[in-house]
Regions:
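Binuclear metal-dependent phosphoesterase catalytic core
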Residues: 3, 101, 123, 227-249
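Structured catalytic core of nucleotide-sugar glycosyltransferases
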Residues: 6-15, 57-65, 105-107
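Active-site metal-binding loops of divalent metal-dependent hydrolases
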Residues: 8-9, 29-31, 57, 81, ...
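A general structural motif
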Residues: 22, 47-49, 73, 126, ...
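Active-site metal-binding motif and surrounding structural segment of the metallo-beta-lactamase
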Residues: 32-78
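Metallo-beta-lactamase
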Residues: 76-127
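Cap/insert and terminal regions of metallo-dependent hydrolase folds
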Residues: 140-239
């Protein structure tokens, strides 16, 4: 059985755990050791081999890496430049797919204002999970890599109108809207339309607390897909405090 659980999602911290009977894959670690332990205490993952994959160096994805990897004795993987930026001497620099037990973890380069950012597409015995956030545009390479995901955890960061009228400075608004920023709800919907299948479970992630709401994100994406007769298995938003549903595949 393959398990997926997003522990936390948003500008104050991101972390996702995916595991089978032997191995635990951690995607990003932007939360504290205490919160990680609280969120995972009843998952039964203590005795699994643990590996951590970091998408980029921003603190909401990496602040807990040192403490948590040390406590769990987890190997850390990321792009070489990202490891350097995080001052992690013991991490493993990756370019292509990494095989760990029954898992494959494929990094896909994305556009974001970090040194060498990636997202991850995870495979395990025919099951595919895509964990995609912190990017301003979606490339054809990424659309192809996500194709037919069983779980698609994808950024729906902002509603453009809320961003336009919101409290951020114009410079920050421009950064968020740029090709190196974050996906809007409609950009997320466009990617889902192209890459999801009828059986895809959709998790909308990294929602801005100031420029989006769960209801607006869900309504925007659902309306886009409904108007194009696009089917999918389920849809939810992941939150900062409660994460996502625990999925067992």
């Amino acid at each position: 059985m393959l398990n997926f659980y997003m522990l936390s999602s948003g500008s104050r911290g991101n972390s996702t755990v995916i595991w089978d009977e032997n191995d635990l894959i951690i995607i990003d670690c932007g939360i504290s050791l205490k919160k990680f332990q609280e969120k995972t205490s009843e998952l039964g993952i203590e005795n699994l081999e643990k590996s951590m994959f970091i998408s980029h160096e921003h603190s909401d994805h990496s602040s807990g890496v040192r403490a948590i990897s040390r406590k769990l004795q987890a190997d850390v993987y990321s792009r070489g430049k990202t490891l350097e930026k995080m001052h992690l001497e013991k991490g493993y620099s990756i370019r292509g797919e990494v095989a760990i037990g029954n898992f494959t973890v494929m990094p896909v380069s994305v556009d974001h204002d970090a040194v060498d950012p990636v997202v991850y597409v995870i495979g395990n015995r025919g099951i595919k999970i895509s964990v995609v956030s912190d990017l301003g545009i979606i490339s054809q390479e990424l659309l192809d890599a996500m194709q037919g995901s069983d779980i698609m955890a994808i950024e729906a960061n902002h509603d453009p109108e809320m961003l336009r009228t919101g409290p951020y400075t114009e410079m920050l608004k421009m950064r968020i809207r740029s090709e190196h920023g974050h996906l809007s709800n409609e950009q997320s919907a466009e990617a889902i339309y192209v890459s999801a299948s009828d059986n895809t479970r959709i998790v909308l992630t990294h929602l801005s607390e100031k420029n989006n709401t769960p209801d607006i994100a869900i309504e925007t994406v659902k309306a886009y897909l409904y108007n194009r007769n696009k089917k999918y298995a389920s849809m939810e938003t992941a939150s900062q405090d409660f994460g996502s549903t625990l999925y067992r595949l």
